[in-house]
Curated annotation (Swiss-Prot):
One of its GO terms (molecular function) is adenyl-nucleotide exchange factor activity. GO terms for biological process: protein folding. Homodimer. It is found in: Cytoplasm. InterPro entries: GrpE (IPR000740), GrpE_coiled_coil (IPR013805), GrpE_head (IPR009012). Participates actively in the response to hyperosmotic and heat shock by preventing the aggregation of stress-denatured proteins, in association with DnaK and GrpE. It is the nucleotide exchange factor for DnaK and may function as a thermosensor. Unfolded proteins bind initially to DnaJ; upon interaction with the DnaJ-bound protein, DnaK hydrolyzes its bound ATP, resulting in the formation of a stable complex. GrpE releases ADP from DnaK; ATP binding to DnaK triggers the release of the substrate protein, thus completing the reaction cycle. It comes from the Bacteria. This is Protein GrpE. The keyword Secreted does not apply.
Length: 186
């Protein structure tokens, strides 16, 4: 019987030690689980960010894949427009050729418009916009506000809102004040 009492007294201490050990083990496992779940969420978020970035890159590549090609076509459009400007619309000898150039230019412009290539062709008097215009010269003007477009040398173009070439323009400036002449000073 004495042996049974000894066993009974050892059992609560042993059970308590085993219980503490198990509680510690459970706590460690719960911490490891929380860390693994946190890491899993971070990896999932990183993966989602990588996917989104890749989709954006592909979208930009599709959107601006034509940029170089469109830039190479701009001098051709400029030449067709210049040819129309310099030809006399009343000359019967060149009328068929002029009509052919007009038709070709219109087809070019319609095709480029389908691919979101837009002309930047400021109207005289429009305020100068450094984002879309490049000032080639400044000229005094009594008729227009300072920093307005006086003349367009060359149209600009943008593709899907991105500038390919700025419009080359002459910008107005305020007239110089008239200095009094020697006769007026006397």
């Amino acid at each position: 019987m004495a042996d049974e009492q000894t066993q009974d007294t050892q059992t609560p201490d042993a059970n308590s030690a085993v219980g503490d050990e198990l509680a510690t083990r459970v706590q460690v496992l719960e911490e490891q689980l929380a860390a693994a779940q946190d890491q899993s969420l971070r990896v999932a978020a990183d993966l989602q960010n990588v996917r989104r970035r890749a989709e954006q890159d592909v979208e930009k590549a599709h959107k601006f894949a034509l940029e170089k090609f469109a830039s190479d076509l701009l001098p051709i459009i400029d030449s067709l427009e210049r040819g129309l400007e310099l030809s006399n619309p009343d000359d019967e000898n060149i009328r068929p050729m002029r009509e052919g150039i007009e038709l070709t230019l219109k087809m070019f412009q319609d095709t480029l418009k389908r691919y979101q290539l837009e002309a930047i062709d400021p109207v005289g008097g429009e305020p100068f916009n450094a984002e879309h215009h490049q000032a080639m010269a400044m000229q005094e003007s009594h008729d227009l506000e300072p920093n307005s477009v006086l003349k367009v040398f060359q149209k600009g173009y943008q593709l899907n809102g991105r500038l390919l070439r700025p419009a080359m323009v002459v910008v107005s400036k305020a007239p110089a004040p008239v200095s009094p002449s020697i006769d007026e000073q006397a």
